[in-house]
Amino acid sequence: MGARASGGPLARAGLLLLLLLLLLLGLLAPGAQGARGRGGAEKNSYRRTVNTFSQSVSSLFGEDNVRAAQKFLARLTERFVLGVDMFVETLWKVWTELLDVLGLDVSNLSQYFSPASVSSSPARALLLVGVVLLAYWFLSLTLGFTFSVLHVVFGRFFWIVRVVLFSMSCVYILHKYEGEPENAVLPLCFVVAVYFMTGPMGFYWRSSPSGPSNPSNPSVEEKLEHLEKQVRLLNIRLNRVLESLDRSKDK
């Protein structure tokens, strides 16, 4: 409580940033709404709401300041989207290399998710389960490492980082799916789920060594080692099942 009470300037700056982000989202959303061509009355009411909000913000902070903030946020959004695209591309390259090591055809992954292929070959079904579990492990490892590092670096100000990342993630998704709001529903749900999982009721907050919970909980390194052991055991069992299926086919 003392940290939040003493952070008056930070709170005001965060409120200003939140208002500017809302204004930016309000300016981006009408384009997506108009591109879908949903009813004139709905678009007009939405535009009136956005115009009212824009006028109130302009009268509060000044029109010149709002325009400068819009330009700054537009440039910041472009750089942020470019950086996230590069990060996602790097993760995809690492993921494809892992699949290549497992002997999977990365160029045609849809063949492993085909219902006909899965029903005709039980080995494909087991391989599909292994790929899903491996993807879950890879995603958990990436998110766990990222948020653990952020929690160690920022400490009790981690909640500010969560709010900023959540806002920028929403901006990124709306920017990528501009004109197709229906396709943005699933990524937004994923971002909201990650936001709540990393909150005070989340796994990483409760069990991290520097968190407010019991310090006797296992560290992140021990959890990663445990996950690696589970993946090794899963690969061994999967190989045994595939070998037994091959032997039964040979007989």
From Swiss-Prot:
Membrane topology summary:
Multi-pass membrane protein
Highest taxon of the lineage: Eukaryota
Residues modified as N6-acetyllysine: K229
Against Pfam families, the record matches this protein to: BRI3BP
UniProt subcellular location: Mitochondrion outer membrane
Tissue-specificity statement: Most abundantly expressed in brain, liver and kidney. Overexpressed in leukemia and lymphoma cell lines, as well as in various carcinomas.
**Residues annotated as signal peptide:** none
Spell out the GO cellular component terms annotated for this protein, sorted alphabetically and separated by semicolons.
Answer: mitochondrial outer membrane; mitochondrion
Which segments of the protein form a coiled coil according to its record? Answer: 217-247
InterPro entries, sorted: BRI3BP
Record's keyword terms, sorted: Acetylation, Coiled coil, Membrane, Mitochondrion, Mitochondrion outer membrane, Phosphoprotein, Proto-oncogene, Transmembrane, Transmembrane helix
Q: Which residues carry this modification: Phosphoserine?
A: S248
Its transmembrane ranges are 13-33, 125-145, 146-166, 185-205
Function, in words: Involved in tumorigenesis and may function by stabilizing p53/TP53.
* Complexes and interactors: Interacts with LETMD1. Interacts with BRI3 (isoforms 1 and 2); the interaction with isoform 2 is weaker than with isoform 1. Interacts with BRI3; the interaction is weak. Interacts with TMEM238L.
Q: What name is this protein filed under?
A: BRI3-binding protein
Recorded name of the encoding gene: BRI3BP
